[in-house]
UniProtKB/Swiss-Prot annotation:
Protein name: DNA-directed RNA polymerase subunit alpha
Domain of life: Eukaryota
Pfam families recorded: RNA_pol_A_bac, RNA_pol_A_CTD, RNA_pol_L
Described function: DNA-dependent RNA polymerase catalyzes the transcription of DNA into RNA using the four ribonucleoside triphosphates as substrates.
Main location: plastid
Gene (name only): rpoA
UniProt keyword terms in alphabetical order: Chloroplast, DNA-directed RNA polymerase, Nucleotidyltransferase, Plastid, Transcription, Transferase
InterPro entries recorded: DNA-dir_RNA_pol_insert, DNA-dir_RNA_pol_RpoA/D/Rpb3, DNA-dir_RpoA, RBP11-like, RNAP_asu_C, RNApol_insert_sf
UniProt xrefs under SUPFAM superfamilies: C-terminal domain of RNA polymerase alpha subunit (SSF47789), Insert subdomain of RNA polymerase alpha subunit (SSF56553), RBP11-like subunits of RNA polymerase (SSF55257)
Provenance organism: Lepidium virginicum (Virginia pepperweed)
Length: 327
């Protein structure tokens, strides 16, 4: 384990790894700081970085297994201790590292008796196993077992469909997430208007990436998301003759609201509470915190008023209108 004393820069913005350790082959931990930041910046960066770490980084997984001896995934094979389902679950947990794109094939071909572990997987050159000791199956008798595997690189997760069977091959739930967890915390220092912040970022990975590698990749992904905004040319918001500015309304909120009132004028809006509208929990909580309790309260707010609510988005306004128009 490597741990360094935190030294805060008072001028130049800089980041540093202050703690790094490997708890096991499949669990790495890293702790980083970024400072000095102005008030509010640490939370902005921390939230964005956490989402990028958990959702934007690609990983490699086994996504399908095939064997001629398997009638269905809840069956048992004579001479093998584990059920087919247990073998598929064990394959799901194999941690791989690669830079491949697309799909690759791998193979397990073993003669019993004996234990089958990750080191028995015959992999393409572009893929490596993080922990060769990961258990797959136990052969109790002198039988031959061959399993073909499909390996893919992606991000997020992919849940198998129970009816998605191709030529006796079985899909495997895949979690393409090298980062197992990420947290951020904030330390404030200074006085009065000169308060500054330190962002602490903790990252746990499955060993296919180190926390430092994950941080770099998440940062690149965030930068790539914002690059298009740097190339927006001002004239794209004007007509070709540059004489009239084009106004792009988000959507005709006012017109839809007027129509809604006309259609439902017979309703007593003040007696319809927002918890009767079956709104998503986040939208409901945002409205309640802003003292919007009834449909009348809601309709008395303009689009501009609603999007000023903390954690409320323009998409939420549209969703509310869609729900109301269906009532």
């Amino acid at each position: 384990m490597v741990r360094e004393k935190v030294k805060v820069s008072t001028r130049t913005l800089q980041w540093k790894c202050v703690e790094s350790r490997r708890d096991s082959k499949r669990l790495y931990y890293g702790r980083f700081i970024l400072s000095p930041l102005m008030k509010g910046q640490a939370d902005t960066i921390g939230i964005a970085m956490r989402r990028a770490l958990l959702g934007e980084i690609e990983g490699t997984c086994i996504t399908r297994a095939k064997s001629e001896n398997i009638p269905h995934d809840y069956s048992n094979i004579v001479g093998i201790q584990e059920s087919v389902h247990e073998i598929l679950m064990n394959l799901n947990e194999i941690v791989l590292r690669s830079n491949l794109y697309g799909t690759r094939n791998a193979l397990i071909c073993v003669q019993g008796p004996g234990y089958i572990t990750a080191q028995d997987i015959i992999l393409p050159p572009s893929v490596e196993i993080i922990d060769n000791t990961q258990h797959i199956a136990t052969l109790m008798e002198p039988i031959d077992l061959c399993i073909g595997l499909k390996i893919e690189r992606n991000r997020g997760y992919s849940l198998k469909m129970s009816n998605n069977f191709e030529d006796r091959s079985y899909p495997i739930d895949a979690v393409f997430m090298p980062v197992q967890n990420a947290n951020h915390s904030i330390h404030s220092y200074g006085n009065g208007n000169e308060k500054q912040e330190i962002l602490f970022l903790e990252i746990w990975t499955n060993g296919s990436l180190t926390p430092k590698e994950a941080l770099h990749e998440a940062s690149r992904n965030l930068i790539n998301l914002f690059i298009p905004f740097l190339h927006v040319e001002e004239e794209t918001f004007y007509l070709e003759n540059n004489q009239h500015q084009v106004t792009l309304p988000l959507f005709p909120f006012h017109n839809r609201l007027v129509n809604l009132r006309k259609k439902k004028k017979e309703l007593a809006f003040q007696y319809i509470f927002i918890d009767q509208l079956e709104l998503p929990p986040r939208i409901y909580n945002c409205l309640k915190k802003s003292n919007i309790h009834t449909l009348l309260d809601l309709l008395n707010n303009s689009q501009e008023d609603l999007i000023k609510i903390e954690h409320f988005h323009i998409e939420d306004v549209k969703k509310i209108l869609d729900i109301l128009e269906k009532k």
